[in-house]
């Protein structure tokens, strides 16, 4: 059993150490130009459709969560009377 574990460890280590690294293009300067551009558009919408959807989903969850928390606090503050 120990031999199997050691073999698995060696295979895993070899796989990790011999994989080629992917070189990604640095897009930071491009994004900086996009977001620093003065075009009158709010910064949370400059990223495109995905940013707009993410913003709306975040606002929906925030408002919904706040409303639910207030509702639960009200229900806890005014419990139903027992007969």
UniProtKB/Swiss-Prot annotation:
Pathway: Energy metabolism; oxidative phosphorylation
Transit pept. (range): 1-23
Any one annotated GO CC term: respiratory chain complex
Subcellular location: Mitochondrion inner membrane
Mitochondrial matrix topological intervals: 24-48
Modified residues (N6-acetyllysine): 33
Cited Pfam families: COX7a (PF02238)
Assembly: Component of the cytochrome c oxidase (complex IV, CIV), a multisubunit enzyme composed of 14 subunits. The complex is composed of a catalytic core of 3 subunits MT-CO1, MT-CO2 and MT-CO3, encoded in the mitochondrial DNA, and 11 supernumerary subunits COX4I, COX5A, COX5B, COX6A, COX6B, COX6C, COX7A, COX7B, COX7C, COX8 and NDUFA4, which are encoded in the nuclear genome.
Protein purpose: Component of the cytochrome c oxidase, the last enzyme in the mitochondrial electron transport chain which drives oxidative phosphorylation. The respiratory chain contains 3 multisubunit complexes succinate dehydrogenase (complex II, CII), ubiquinol-cytochrome c oxidoreductase (cytochrome b-c1 complex, complex III, CIII) and cytochrome c oxidase (complex IV, CIV), that cooperate to transfer electrons derived from NADH and succinate to molecular oxygen, creating an electrochemical gradient over the inner membrane that drives transmembrane transport and the ATP synthase.
The name this protein goes by in its record: Cytochrome c oxidase subunit 7A2, mitochondrial
């Amino acid at each position: 059993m120990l031999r199997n574990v050691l073999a698995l460890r060696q295979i895993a280590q070899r796989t990790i150490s011999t994989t080629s690294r992917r070189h990604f293009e640095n897009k930071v300067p491009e994004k900086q130009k996009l977001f620093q551009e003065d075009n009158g558009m709010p910064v949370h919408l400059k990223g495109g459709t995905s940013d707009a959807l993410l913003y709306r989903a975040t606002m929906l969850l925030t408002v919904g969560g706040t409303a639910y928390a207030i509702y639960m606090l009200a229900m806890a503050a005014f419990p139903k009377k027992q007969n």
